[in-house]
Amino acid sequence: MKLVPRFRKQWFAYLTVLCLALAAAVSFGVPAKAAENPQTSVSNTGKEADATKNQTSKADQVSAPYEGTGKTSKSLYGGQTELEKNIQTLQPSSIIGTDERTRISSTTSFPYRATVQLSIKYPNTSSTYGCTGFLVNPNTVVTAGHCVYSQDHGWASTITAAPGRNGSSYPYGTYSGTMFYSVKGWTESKDTNYDYGAIKLNGSPGNTVGWYGYRTTNSSSPVGLSSSVTGFPCDKTFGTMWSDTKPIRSAETYKLTYTTDTYGCQSGSPVYRNYSDTGQTAIAIHTNGGSSYNLGTRVTNDVFNNIQYWANQ
């Protein structure tokens, strides 16, 4: 059908109005779905919670450390399990130049005794994987998200924790994980900015070994601050604890970077320093490395709030 110019313009105007009306009907008829918060807490049982508080204050949030009693009496712990020696690493970490890590022999000293070796098993694989974690209260271990939730295998099936391990010596025994936590940004989106999590234990070793403090670094930049990374690397004698201390290299919104030497199985190690007002306090959670620096998930307001939520469960 051929339209004369006058009717062609009218027909075009009619179609334009019709399209706009249909678009309005669709947009107003179907409510828009709210964007999902990547910091939403999730657990291996499917429980979800939003512990974030939309905080914009530049004041630091601080949770203080506790040194514990340090006693090594066998009556204080939940048993002892020999952790497997064919342990696998989950994420690469780097030696930056010369390896300057030193072995921690006094693992019963604080804060080393609050540093935890993790032996992890996942569904559908016979391998055992290694990570590190650190206690933040009597029964809560903070670690990397990829230690509790593997992008290849899903949630861990079992996690065995050995505080203050020293080679074949377990001065505080071993504990089993009873609940695992991370956030949706990691478990659903695989976003390394949200690579952190926690483990609840079947006992309370923190009353004995103590726990690390943790804090945000909102009030002033952590760049240049001397910080340590302590954990259980897989390239050293099995089950031994090693540490290195260097300045923070850069501070991004979700990450801190540093040239501190680390290796596989140190994922989840505390990135910490001895603050004059709070003592041994973590400011990041070590996750992975590259050729020129290593990285950790920064303790932001949201990370702080989730750790507190998990600790209170």
From Swiss-Prot:
Enzyme Commission number, as recorded: 3.4.21.-
Domain of life: Bacteria
Cell compartment(s), UniProt: Secreted
Annotated GO MF terms: serine-type endopeptidase activity
Location, primary (coarse class): secreted
Top-rank EC class of the record's enzyme: hydrolase
GTP-binding among keywords: no
Signal peptide: 1-34
One GO term of the biological process aspect: proteolysis
Disulfide bridge partners, by residue number: C131-C147
UniProt cross-references to InterPro entries, sorted A to Z: Glutamyl_endopeptidase, Peptidase_S1_PA, Peptidase_S1_PA_chymotrypsin, Peptidase_S1B, Trypsin_dom, TRYPSIN_HIS, V8_his_AS, V8_ser_AS
Active site, renumbered: H146, S267
Bias type Polar residues, positions: 37-60
One annotated Gene Ontology cellular component of this protein: extracellular region
Keyword field: Disulfide bond, Hydrolase, Protease, Secreted, Serine protease, Signal, Zymogen
Pro-peptide region(s): 35-93
Summary of subunit composition and partner proteins: Monomer.
Stated family: Belongs to the peptidase S1B family.
PANTHER family associated with the record: SERINE PROTEASE
Name assigned to this protein: Extracellular metalloprotease
Upper lineage: Bacteria, Bacillati, Bacillota, Bacilli, Bacillales
Gene coding for it: mpr
